[in-house]
A protein has these predicted regions:
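Extreme N-terminal starter segment of soluble prokaryotic enzymes
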Residues: 1-5
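Short beta-strand to alpha-helix junction loop
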Residues: 82-102
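Short, well-ordered alpha-helices that flank and scaffold nucleotide-derived cofactor binding pockets
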Residues: 19, 23, 51, 102, ...
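Glycine-rich FAD pyrophosphate-binding loop
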Residues: 6-10, 19-41
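N-terminal Rossmann-fold NAD(P) dinucleotide-binding loop
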Residues: 14-15
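Predominantly flavin-linked oxidoreductase catalytic cores and closely associated redox partners
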Residues: 10, 103-192
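N-terminal FAD cofactor-binding segment of flavoenzymes
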Residues: 33-72
Length: 192
């Protein structure tokens, strides 16, 4: 009997889960709807995560050792790392996510450029779950409707999780990430 697992969401959590499953010889499918998705969140990663994700140097765009954080109420916090070997790695999420997905795929996980539309949860888990999805692999913006039966589902599809909704995990009342771009005059900037 071969265990089949769908990992919904191909960001860091989903890709690392898929990598672990594939290493264990489990038939693994990674679903990601936007393979080139540039996201504002998660671009700053601490040194411990660089080693935990086993990221190569080319994934890290910049190594930040000094920064200033300013809250909306104008409270400032200066962060300085004294050890020259320590840094916060700045990376582009679309680059890091693609690297992690590709690594999982190289171990046998099957990457599906698709969007989950529906999940049929079976009674008592005695039958496989049925995922209905739009497959964008052929480049068609509408996608081709497909289904896949799996034994387990890993929900790594973010704040508006289709998996969480399907299992009635409840609603989220708080934003967990945001991005704001502001223009600052050069005399207000500090360079390190």
């Amino acid at each position: 009997l071969t265990l089949r697992v769908a990992v919904v969401g191909g960001g860091p959590a989903g890709s690392c889960a898929a990598e672990t499953l594939a290493k264990a010889g489990i038939e693994t499918y990674i679903f990601e709807r936007k393979l080139d998705n540039a996201k504002p969140c998660g671009g700053a990663i601490p040194l411990c995560m660089v080693s935990e994700f086993d990221l190569p140097d080319h994934i890290i765009d910049r190594r930040v050792r000094n920064m200033k954080m300013i809250s909306p109420s104008n409270v400032e916090v200066d962060i300085k790392l004294d050890n020259p070997d320590e840094y916060i790695g700045m990376c582009r999420r679309e680059v890091m996510d693609a690297f992690l997905r590709d690594r999982a795929a190289s171990l046998g996980a099957k990457l599906i450029n698709g969007r989950i539309l529906d999940i049929k949860i079976t009674e008592n888990g005695k039958k496989p779950y049925v995922l209905s999805y739009s497959d964008f692999t052929d480049g068609n913006n509408e996608g081709t409707m497909r289904t896949l039966e799996v034994d387990l589902i890993v929900g790594a599809d973010g704040a508006n999780s289709v998996v969480a909704k399907a299992m009635d995990a409840g609603d989220y009342n708080y934003a967990i990430a945001f991005q704001e771009r502001i223009r600052i005059s050069p005399d207000k900037m500090e360079y390190y």
